[in-house]
């Protein structure tokens, strides 16, 4: 055995001492340099591994079946590599199989590459998911959730593409037409007289205006009568009594800007986009990286019919909840039932969220929104919060007193000390500077509270 050298395996029968042969199953294209070696060395190596001792019994061990059925079994059981080569021989009563892998087909290389890429992607996604911050935007309808989300796009430099700008343009035109139609209807129901003669024809024309699929030429045709109506004292008086009916807060902004909106080259500005109103239906997500951490904002509709969809977003991946309240709506009722106070509705929803065991350990950030509109109402001598909340003890025309009253009303719903701390901010969602300052504070709070979970250094 000591003098036997295995230099090349071919399909030819190769004679070795003791009439043992190497046969079958080995192709001619095997590189002789790759497979060069001494059979004695291979067998001695195996004896060392299994703890066998050399001796007469070992010396008589047969080496027949050097290429045996073991190769075929291995080929059938696990090998999909058509160019793999197997060399098997018997030593110490055991079958030793050597697998020599010479090359792979292009298909196999492509499969292995794809598999590695998938593994890398999954690992990266797993790492990103662990690090992401997921924020739920909750609150009653028209509380400013979608406006806050628009601000996140603007603040973080995510541009509105052309198709989206066209969509906002159409929504803005609809806001103007429907807003004027609501004011015309309210003027009649409230028995408010026209401020000047000759407005009946303009009113008639406005009521017949089509809101859907408005383009610039059509809106330019509608703009003159709408502008004349908005200048009428009767329509202005109806708008001042808007708490008595349902109308969007932004109608006055667009009616004041109607001449600019009715130009041939009109493109919505950021301010226009922030003021336009379209009810959110379903669930909408927006992701932006903040300090290399993915912040995922989830916006869901706040109307009663949409709140059943909130539960889809309640899972263990939620980092914080931002709850928005329209603080100026203490004198308004819901559009859904025309009797429930809007501020009370928001407080009841907040109560449900804060005391829900699902959110134990999750920070809750309360945005008392629409501070600008609250200031207008509080400073108006014709409005008094005590008409709606008789137990209010402060100055009804002090913005600070009214804000503190509303804040305590919401903070008082917390029934368990085990609930996470509630943070609060007074906000104006249409004010980019205000939201930027507030979000920086919120961001720092969230990152600090979740330092370990986010694996930051």
UniProtKB/Swiss-Prot annotation:
One GO BP: gastrulation involving germ band extension
Q: Where is this region: G2 motif?
A: 272-280
Q: Which Gene3D superfamilies match?
A: GI Alpha 1, domain 2-like (1.10.400.10), P-loop containing nucleotide triphosphate hydrolases (3.40.50.300)
Q: Where in the cell is it found?
A: Cytoplasm
Which stretches does the entry tag as region G5 motif? 427-432
Give the residue ranges for region: G1 motif.
134-147
The UniProt annotation places Mg(2+) binding at 146, 280
Alphabetized UniProt keyword annotations: Cytoplasm, Developmental protein, Gastrulation, GTP-binding, Magnesium, Metal-binding, Nucleotide-binding, Transducer
Quaternary structure annotation from Swiss-Prot or TrEMBL: G proteins are composed of 3 units; alpha, beta and gamma. The alpha chain contains the guanine nucleotide binding site.
Q: Family membership, please give it.
A: Belongs to the G-alpha family. G(12) subfamily.
Q: What is this protein called?
A: Guanine nucleotide-binding protein subunit alpha homolog
Q: Which organism is it from?
A: Drosophila melanogaster (Fruit fly)
């Amino acid at each position: 055995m000591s003098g036997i050298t295995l230099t090349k395996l071919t399909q030819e029968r190769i004679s070795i001492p003791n009439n043992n042969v190497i046969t079958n199953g080995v192709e001619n294209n095997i590189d002789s340099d790759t497979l060069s070696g001494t059979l004695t060395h291979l067998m001695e190596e195996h004896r060392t591994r299994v703890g066998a001792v050399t001796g007469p019994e070992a010396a008589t061990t047969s080496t027949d079946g050097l290429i045996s059925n073991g190769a075929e079994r291995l080929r059938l059981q696990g090998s999909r590599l058509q160019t793999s080569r197997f060399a098997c021989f018997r030593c110490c009563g055991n079958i030793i199989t050597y697998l020599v892998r010479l090359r792979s087909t292009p298909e196999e290389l492509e499969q292995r590459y794809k598999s590695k890429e998938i593994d890398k992607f999954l690992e990266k996604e797993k790492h990103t998911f662990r690090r992401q911050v997921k924020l739920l935007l909750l609150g009653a309808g028209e509380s400013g959730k979608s406006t806050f989300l628009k601000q996140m796009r603007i603040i973080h430099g995510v541009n509105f593409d052309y198709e989206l700008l066209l969509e906002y343009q159409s929504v803005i035109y609809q806001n103007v037409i429907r807003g004027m139609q609501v004011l015309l209807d309210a003027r009649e129901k409230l028995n408010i007289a026209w401020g000047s003669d000759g407005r009946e024809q303009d009113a008639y024309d406005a009521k017949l205006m089509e809101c859907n699929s408005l383009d610039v030429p059509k809106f330019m045709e509608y703009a003159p009568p709408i502008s004349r109506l908005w200048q009428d004292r009767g329509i202005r008086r109806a708008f001042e009594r808007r708490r008595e009916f349902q109308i969007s807060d932004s109608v006055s902004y667009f009616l004041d800007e109607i001449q600019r909106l009715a130009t041939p080259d009109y493109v919505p500005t950021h301010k226009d986009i922030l003021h336009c109103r379209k009810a959110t239906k379903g669930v909408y997500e927006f992701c932006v990286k903040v300090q290399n951490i993915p912040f995922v904002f989830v916006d869901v509709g706040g109307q009663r019919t949409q709140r059943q969809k909130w539960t889809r977003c309640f899972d263990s991946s939620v980092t914080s909840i931002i709850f928005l309240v329209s603080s100026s709506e203490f004198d308004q009722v819901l559009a859904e039932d025309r009797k429930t106070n809007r501020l009370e509705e928001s407080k009841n929803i907040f109560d449900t969220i804060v005391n829900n065991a699902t959110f134990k350990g999750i920070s809750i950030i309360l945005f008392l929104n629409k501070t600008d509109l609250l200031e207008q109402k509080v400073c108006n001598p014709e409005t008094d919060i005590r008409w709606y909340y008789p137990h209010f003890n402060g100055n009804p025309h002090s913005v600070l007193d009214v804000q503190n009253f509303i804040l305590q009303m919401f903070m008082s719903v917390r029934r368990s000390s085990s609930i996470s701390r509630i943070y609060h901010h007074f906000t104006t969602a249409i004010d980019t500077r205000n939201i930027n300052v507030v979000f920086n504070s919120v961001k720092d709070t969230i990152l600090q509270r979740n330092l370990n979970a986010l694996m930051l250094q």
